[in-house]
Every structure is written in structure tokens, then in C-alpha cells.
Amino acid sequence: MLINYLMLLFAAMIIRSFADSGNAIETTLPEITNATTDIPAIRLCGPEGDGYCLHGDCIHARDIDGMYCRCSHGYTGIRCQHVVLVDYQRSEKPNTTTSYIPSPGIMLVLVGIIIITCCLLSVYRFTRRTKLPLQDMVVP
């Protein structure tokens, strides 16, 4: 029900924006017959909620009975009583990507190890090819 109400509200906003821009659009929206649509989905608590939330706004949700807190930035908890640590806030940022870029020193060490390994392999192959078998050797 709430989703249908939000979709109708969104459609009405789009139609109003077209009407404001001079483009005329004629459409009919279905009427909502449910009486609960007059009550906003979320509303502030009022005087009975003063002091309930320590660092935020006290709200009533239409679908859920009771008071709830909408915490200010940097606070969390049922009554917004806990401070969010700085490191925790950094890790919760959306769309953060961590990429590992090896330092130039590490890259030089790896390239050096590869070059030394190639040199040792070529020396080993060269000496193995040039060795004479024991049977062909002449002892004086």
C-alpha cells in the first residue's frame, strides 16, 4: 500500500514538473480510498517525545507502534546514545574502493630477483652443454 502511494506521489510530481515547463500532459490518477493515507508515514513525536532521543529526532512510524529515533550524523543506538568512532565512520562510507599499488621499491626487488634467476638459469644451461662426457676425457 505504501509503495502504491509513493508511486502515485512520484507520478504526480513528474506531471507537475511537465505542467510547469509548459508541456501539457493530461492524465487521470486513480483515487486512493484508504483512509490511512491522510496520515504521513513518518511524523515527529511531539511533546511526548521530548528528551527521548539523546542526539537525534524522535519519530512515529505509521506502520509500527512506538517512538523511534532518527540519529544525527555521528551517533547510533536505539536512543542515539552511542558515538560512532571515526575509524568506523570511514569504513562505512559508500562507494569507497581500496586498491593496492605496490611501491617502487618492492617492484625493483621483484624485477631484480627475476633478472638474477634468468642469469643463473642461462649460466647453468651453458655449462651443462659445454661439459665433456667422462669417457671422452684423456688422462695424461
Swiss-Prot record:
One of its GO terms (biological process) is epidermal growth factor receptor signaling pathway. Vaccinia growth factor interacts with host EGFR and promotes EGFR dimerization. Glycans are attached at residues 34, 95. One of its GO terms (cellular component) is extracellular space. The record marks 96-97 as: Cleavage (By host protease). It comes from Vaccinia virus (strain Tian Tan). Residues 122-140 are cytoplasmic. The chain crosses the membrane at residues 101-121. Residues 19-100 are extracellular. Induction: Expressed in the early phase of the viral replicative cycle. SUPFAM superfamilies: EGF/Laminin (SSF57196). Gene3D superfamilies: Laminin (2.10.25.10). Belongs to the orthopoxvirus OPG019 family. Keywords: Disulfide bond, Early protein, EGF-like domain, Glycoprotein, Growth factor, Host membrane, Host-virus interaction, Membrane, Secreted, Signal, Transmembrane, Transmembrane helix. Stimulates cellular proliferation (hyperplasia)and mobility around infected cells to promote rapid and efficient spread of infection. This effect is beneficial for virus replication in vivo, because poxviruses replicate possibly better in proliferating cells than in quiescent cells. Acts by binding host EGFR, inducing its dimerization, autophosphorylation and leading to activation of several cellular pathways regulating cell proliferation or cell survival. Residues 1-18 form the signal peptide. This is Pro-vaccinia growth factor.
